[in-house]
Every structure is written in C-alpha cells, then in structure tokens.
Amino acid sequence: MTKLAQWLWGLAILGSTWAALTTGALGLELPLSCQEVLWPLPAYLLVSAGCYALGTVGYRVATFHDCEDAARELQSQIQEARADLARRGLRF
C-alpha cells in the first residue's frame, strides 16, 4: 500500500467518524459542549497541519547545510556533459 493510500484511508476513517458523530447516525446523544467542539474540528485539524508543515519547512530551511564538495563534483560533471555534447555537435 502506498503512502498516499494510507493517508486517504486514514482521512476516510476520520471523516466518516466525524460525519457519523455530527449527524447523530450512531445514535449517541453528545452533550452540547462536545457538539460545539466537534463541528469545527476539521478546520482546526487542517490549520494545525498547515502550521506544522510551515514550521517544519522553516526549520529545515534554517538548518540547511551547504554541500560544497558535492556542488564542485556536480559542476565538473556538468562540464563533462557539455563537452561530450559539444563533441556530438550540440551547440549551447
């Protein structure tokens, strides 16, 4: 099972549970305070996931390390590829 399928199954289970609880399909009588929290729960979860993603990307960008050796190696490979393509008649 791919990661996408796992996420979709998880979202389907959470969504169906939320829908069943909010519509009363299970026959449970939830207190009014629980119902008031339950209705906007998907929006809260979406905003929380967005904040987590933004924080993770920001942290990874802030702690990104330069790979100077790999950059030099890549530049030399690019030069070799350009020279090979120039020998084969490709003009840049």
From Swiss-Prot:
GO CC terms, sorted: dolichol-phosphate-mannose synthase complex; endoplasmic reticulum membrane
InterPro entries, per database record? DPM3
Which cysteines are cross-linked by disulfides? none
Instruction: For this entry, list what GO says about its biological process.
Output: dolichol metabolic process; GPI anchor biosynthetic process; protein glycosylation; regulation of protein stability
Which Pfam families does this chain map to? Answer: DPM3 (PF08285)
Q: Which domain of life is it from?
A: Eukaryota
Q: Which residues cross the membrane?
A: 8-28, 37-57
Alphabetical keyword list: Endoplasmic reticulum, Membrane, Transmembrane, Transmembrane helix
Compartments it resides in: Endoplasmic reticulum membrane
| Topology in the lipid bilayer | Multi-pass membrane protein
Which spans of this chain does the record mark as coiled coil? none
A GO MF label: enzyme activator activity
Say yes or no: keyword Hydrolase present: no
Homology family: Belongs to the DPM3 family.
The protein's role, per its UniProt record: Stabilizer subunit of the dolichol-phosphate mannose (DPM) synthase complex; tethers catalytic subunit DPM1 to the endoplasmic reticulum.
Cross-referenced PANTHER family: DOLICHOL-PHOSPHATE MANNOSYLTRANSFERASE SUBUNIT 3
Instruction: State whether it acts alone or in a complex, and with which partners, per the record.
Output: Component of the dolichol-phosphate mannose (DPM) synthase complex composed of DPM1, DPM2 and DPM3; within the complex, associates with DPM1 via its C-terminal domain and with DPM2 via its N-terminal portion. This interaction stabilizes DPM1 protein.
What's the protein here called? Dolichol-phosphate mannosyltransferase subunit 3
Q: What organism is listed for this UniProt entry?
A: Pongo abelii
